[in-house]
Amino acid sequence: MGRTRPKKLTSKASIPIVREHEIDIIDDEVQNALQQVETGVEKAEESEFHLQAAISATAQGKVNEAHIPTPETVLSNLRYDELYPPIFSQPATYIRFSSTIEDCCGCPYNMTEEDDVFFKIMNEKREPSNRITEDQFEEVMYFFEETAQTKQPFAAVDSPPVLSFAEMQDSMDATVEESVKCFAKDIYEHWKLRRIATGNRPLLPSLKFETGQDTDDTDPYVCFRRREVRQIRKTRGRDAQSADKLRRLRKELEDARQLVALVRQRELARKEMLSMERQIFLQRSEVKEMKRKLNIKDDDEDLINQKVTSIPARLPHAFANLPEQPKKKPAEAPAAQRPTAPQIRMPQKPGTQAADDMQLLEDVQAEKENEILRDIKQNIAKHIKWNEGYVDYTRAPLSPPPEKTFQAAFRPAITTQLPTPPSSDSSDNMMLESALDTANSLSFRDKLVPRTWEMNEDTCRIPSFRRRIGRGGRLMIDRRNMASRCRIEMDPLKADRFKYDREDSDDESEFECDPYDVQIMQHRAIMAAKARDQAAAAAQAHAQAQAQKRLQAEQTTTNNGPPNIGHTMGSNPGPGAVASTS
């Protein structure tokens, strides 16, 4: 057989077939020289003398001649069956054992020869009743070692000073017995000397590990060696992913811990509530029995849980003056027997107003409405200021354009529906209007235009006339007809194309809006306020114009005397008639 391990047989590998008579007879001595038996040990150890002798003897069938020397087996005299009787009983729960080996084996510190010498000397100096035992001595020494390891974990590297006894005494807790603390000061001096002698290294024997990056394969006392594994390539993404996983795990554990704490708090509150209810029930039972013994006839309202009455809300002024309906009162018990029910009132929160100082809903709504109107007026004033020097031809301008006045030259001829004055007008008014014809040039327009005529109507579609005086005092009247449409000669075929062309389409999307939306309601409020302001301004302007007309009429009557009736045009002038004076 070869030294190499045979490969695995596959269906594709060709294997030669050898007959029995085709095998060459090989000498046994030559065959024995070859390594036909796998030793099972490392290659470096196959040259060991006793191993080679044992392999050769096994190959030749002479097993008794050579063997590997091993130590003889020594039987122990300890009787484990007597020391550890088989009385173990399997527990019923799934948790078989929860203690660690360190908890079961006791104190891990073992006394040495130096400790034994110091232990005997210390006990000889003390009385027999005040001597320390070996277990107590080991417990104190282990406490010193554990405290030094906790406070100085790198003492063997940094070589710091040994911990003082005051620091050791501060670290003593309930784990150290009171009977042992009195020996701690004497034992500390011995422990300190041993610690200084070892270079402030731990006194307890510990396993030796590999220290540093270089591995020492020749040191037989190294307990655990590092595995020679190729280091995984680390990237920032893997580091961030690992940190996220740890952060998520910590959050989940913290949430679970908080949930458990909240569940515990809830169950404790439930337990306390149940205990209180049970106590209340027992006390109510005692009260009931006491009432029966004393023959007290009363209702059982104090034996049941009463509902907490809420504070009644304040009624508005509209319902404050209404008489309250009288309620039927139950039969009252005697004052001596009726228990006084506790009055439950909600404490008033700091910073809140009392019920008497609360504002009414009408006041709040009025204040909000005034604030909205104030904002609207401010916005209108801002728009008027912005539009100074410009003419706003929008559909509904916030700042209305100036009122259009008739030109001094041309005046529109308006057809009046009532050519004769109404019956309610007196003859004095007629005489007054006739007198104004010669005094004021505007009186002619006042006779043709009714008093309800608005100055801001479009006069471009009304024919207008102009009176002027020519040479020799001749009176001339110029006429201006209505503006005709602009006629553009267009091909009838092209005009027919636009016959049914409209700007609007039936396929336009309709936008649905909520009429009670805040923005729409605010827009309607703004429009209504603007209309009210415009109506008020128009009424004020109309009143001022009427007052000015009356004042001018009075001044004219005073200066010119009685009116001249001869200049009137008759009682029924035709539509579009113009008065002329010579």
Curated annotation (Swiss-Prot):
It is found in: Nucleus. Keywords: Cell cycle, Coiled coil, DNA damage, DNA repair, Nucleus, Transcription, Transcription regulation. GO terms for biological process: DNA repair; regulation of transcription by RNA polymerase II. Pfam families: EPL1. The keyword Ribosomal protein does not apply. It comes from the Eukaryota. InterPro entries: Enhancer_polycomb (IPR024943), Enhancer_polycomb-like_N (IPR019542). The keyword Nucleus applies. GO terms for cellular component: NuA4 histone acetyltransferase complex; nucleus; piccolo histone acetyltransferase complex. Residues 539-555 have a biased composition (Low complexity). Residues 238-295, 352-385 form a coiled coil. Residues 323-351, 539-582 are annotated as: Disordered. Belongs to the enhancer of polycomb family. Component of the NuA4 histone acetyltransferase complex. Component of the NuA4 histone acetyltransferase complex which is involved in transcriptional activation of selected genes principally by acetylation of nucleosomal histone H4 and H2A. The NuA4 complex is also involved in DNA repair. Involved in gene silencing by neighboring heterochromatin, blockage of the silencing spreading along the chromosome, and required for cell cycle progression through G2/M. This is Enhancer of polycomb-like protein 1. It comes from Aspergillus fumigatus (strain ATCC MYA-4609 / CBS 101355 / FGSC A1100 / Af293).
